[in-house]
Swiss-Prot record:
Induction: Up-regulated during germ cell differentiation in testis. This is Transcription initiation factor IIA subunit 1. It comes from Mus musculus (Mouse). Its main location: nucleus. It is found in: Nucleus. Belongs to the TFIIA subunit 1 family. TFIIA is a heterodimer of the large unprocessed subunit 1 and a small subunit gamma. It was originally believed to be a heterotrimer of an alpha (p35), a beta (p19) and a gamma subunit (p12). TFIIA forms a complex with TBP. TFIIA is a component of the transcription machinery of RNA polymerase II and plays an important role in transcriptional activation. TFIIA in a complex with TBP mediates transcriptional activity. One of its GO terms (cellular component) is transcription factor TFIID complex. The alpha and beta subunits are postranslationally produced from the precursor form by TASP1. The cleavage promotes proteasomal degradation. The record marks 276-277 as: Cleavage. The modification N-acetylalanine is found at residue 2. One of its GO terms (molecular function) is RNA polymerase II general transcription initiation factor binding. Residues 69-79, 89-106, 247-281 have a biased composition (Low complexity).
Length: 378
C-alpha cells in the first residue's frame, strides 16, 4: 500500500488532540466547580496510557526526556555499587567463622510436666458461677469434683448454661459425681433455706422446667418451690405443680342449626300499578344506545388490528441494514483503518481503494495519512 504517512507527525497529532480536549472542557469544569488540578491529572493520565500502549514512538515531552536520560545515567552507577556490595558480603563469612567456633553450649533443663489442675469448690453456691464449657454435656461422661464435707449427700444444682446437675455419693465415699439431668430454659438462683426438722427446701426463682408427662402441652404449668426431705439414708423429692386450666373455647353451633338473624328483614316497598296507559319505552332506547356503542368498539378494534398488521410487516430494504452483531465482528481484528474514501473500483473479485485523511493501526503501531491507495481480493 502506497501512502504518504509520516510517523514523526503522529506524536504531534496526539498531543494536539489532548490539548484541544483539555482546553475545550476547562470552562465546563470550572462552571461545575471542578478544580483545574483535576484537568492536569487527566491530561497526565491520558499521556501515560498512550505511552504504555507503545503505539506511538517519540511521544515524550522535554521534561520526560530529561528524566529518562538521568535515569539511564544512574543505572550504571547502581550496578557498580551493587557489584561492590555483593563482593563485600562474600568476604564477611570468612571473618565470622572463627567467632562461631568459640560459641559456648548452654544446657537447658527439661521442664517438669504440668500436673492437671484440681477443681476445689469451697461452697455449693459457687457451682452456679462455673463456666458451662468446663463440664462435659455428654451423657456417657461424668464430671468428678472434690467437694467439701459440708455438702449434703443429695443436691440439685443449676449451671449458667441452664443444665440441672445432681450430686450423688460414690461407692468409695470420697468423691461426688455430677450427672447431667434435664436442661431447663431459664435459671436464676438456688437459695437453700434450712427449715426445722432437718428439711432443706431450696427456693427456685424464675425456673422454667420441662413439662411433666401427665400434663397436656396446651395446659400451663406453674412451678412451685420443691422440697427435699431427708429420712435416714433415703431421699424424697416432692415437686409441687399446679396445672392452670386452658381457657375454655366458645361452643360452636351445630351444622344443621341456623343462627337467628340479628336484624329483621326489610319490608319490600309496595308495588304501584300503572293504569293510565302503556308502559314506558326508556328501556328500549337504552338498549339501542348500548348496541350502537358495541358496534363502535368493534370498528375501533378492527382499525387497530389493521394498523398493527401494517407495523408488523417487514419494511422495504430491510436486508440492507447492518445489525449490531455484524458491526462487532467487523472490528474484531488487529489491524484497523479509519478514513474517508474518494473512489472504489471493482473488477470481478478485485477491489481498488482510493483513501484519504485517515489513521490506521498496523501491527500495534499508529499511522496517519492524507492519501492512500490499496488493492484487495475477496
Amino acid at each position: 500500500m502506497a501512502n504518504s504517512a509520516n510517523t514523526n507527525t503522529v506524536p504531534k497529532l496526539y498531543r494536539s488532540v489532548i490539548e484541544d480536549v483539555i482546553n475545550d472542557v476547562r470552562d465546563i469544569f470550572l462552571d461545575d466547580g471542578v478544580d483545574e488540578q483535576v484537568l492536569m491529572e487527566l491530561k497526565t493520565l491520558w499521556e501515560n496510557k498512550l505511552m504504555q500502549s507503545r503505539a506511538v514512538d517519540g511521544f515524550h515531552s522535554e521534561e520526560q526526556q530529561l528524566l529518562l536520560q538521568v535515569q539511564q545515567q544512574h543505572q550504571p552507577q547502581q550496578q557498580q555499587h551493587h557489584h561492590h556490595h555483593h563482593q563485600h558480603q562474600q568476604a564477611q563469612p570468612q571473618q565470622t567463622v572463627p567467632q562461631q567456633a568459640q560459641t559456648q553450649q548452654v544446657l537447658i533443663p527439661a521442664s517438669q510436666q504440668a500436673t492437671a489442675p484440681q477443681v476445689i469448690v469451697p461452697d455449693s453456691k459457687l457451682l452456679q458461677h462455673m463456666n458451662a464449657s468446663s463440664i462435659t454435656s455428654a451423657a456417657a461422661t461424668a464430671a468428678t469434683l472434690a467437694l467439701p464435707a459440708g455438702v449434703t449427700p443429695v443436691q440439685q444444682l443449676l449451671t449458667n448454661s441452664g443444665q440441672l446437675l445432681q450430686v450423688v455419693r460414690a461407692a468409695n465415699g470420697a468423691q461426688y459425681i455430677l450427672q447431667p439431668q434435664q436442661s431447663v430454659v431459664l435459671q436464676q438462683q438456688v437459695i437453700p433455706q434450712m427449715q426445722p426438722g432437718g428439711v432443706q427446701a431450696p427456693v427456685i426463682q424464675q425456673v422454667l422446667a420441662p413439662l411433666p408427662g401427665g400434663i397436656s402441652p396446651q395446659t400451663g404449668v406453674i412451678i412451685q418451690p420443691q422440697q427435699i426431705l431427708f429420712t435416714g439414708n433415703k431421699t424424697q423429692v416432692i415437686p409441687t405443680t399446679v396445672a392452670a386450666p386452658a381457657p375454655a373455647q366458645a361452643p360452636m353451633p351445630a351444622a344443621g342449626q341456623q343462627q337467628p338473624q340479628a336484624q329483621p328483614a326489610q319490608q319490600q316497598a309496595p308495588l304501584v300499578l300503572q293504569v293510565d296507559g302503556t308502559g314506558d319505552t326508556s328501556s328500549e332506547e337504552d338498549e339501542d344506545e348500548e348496541e350502537d356503542y358495541d358496534d363502535d368498539e368493534e370498528e375501533d378494534k378492527e382499525k387497530d388490528g389493521a394498523e398493527d398488521g401494517q407495523v408488523e410487516e417487514e419494511p422495504l430494504n430491510s436486508e440492507d441494514d447492518v445489525s449490531d452483531e455484524e458491526g462487532q465482528e467487523l472490528f474484531d481484528t488487529e489491524n484497523v483503518v479509519v478514513c474517508q474514501y474518494d473512489k472504489i473500483h471493482r473488477s470481478k473479485n478485485k477491489w481498488k481503494f482510493h483513501l484519504k485523511d485517515g489513521i490506521m493501526n498496523l501491527n500495534g503501531r499508529d499511522y496517519i495519512f492524507s492519501k492512500a491507495i490499496g488493492d484487495a481480493e475477496w
